[in-house]
Amino acid sequence: MPQNWGKLGWRNEGSLGFVSTTYFENARPMYICAMYDPSWNNHIVKYFSSNDPGCEGYHPIEWGYFEGYLSSTQVPGTVPLYRCYIEATKDHFDTRSSDCEGEPAAKLEFVLGYIFL
């Protein structure tokens, strides 16, 4: 996490689970990516998780963007990690909740993979 995470409005809500730092069969990589605002000296304005090493056309974070490996299939001891999106604010968030934590403006995008508990 960036050092200024509190100023970004982030809050620690606890752990969702764990990723593996070691490749395994059916592993799917997860990256942390950033959206920059070109009108504000390319300041980072949003972070999001992605399975795409190209960050879906955005940018890898500067301090090491490879987060770890998720399972691409559900195996014992794993749960789905969902990615949700709020169009109005361009916010992505990860959750174990298939209804995006009941956030009315959020839409479920996809399952990033399966995280270890």
Predicted regions: what they are:
Residues 1-117:
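Extracellular glycan-binding segments that recognize GlcNAc-based cell-wall polysaccharides
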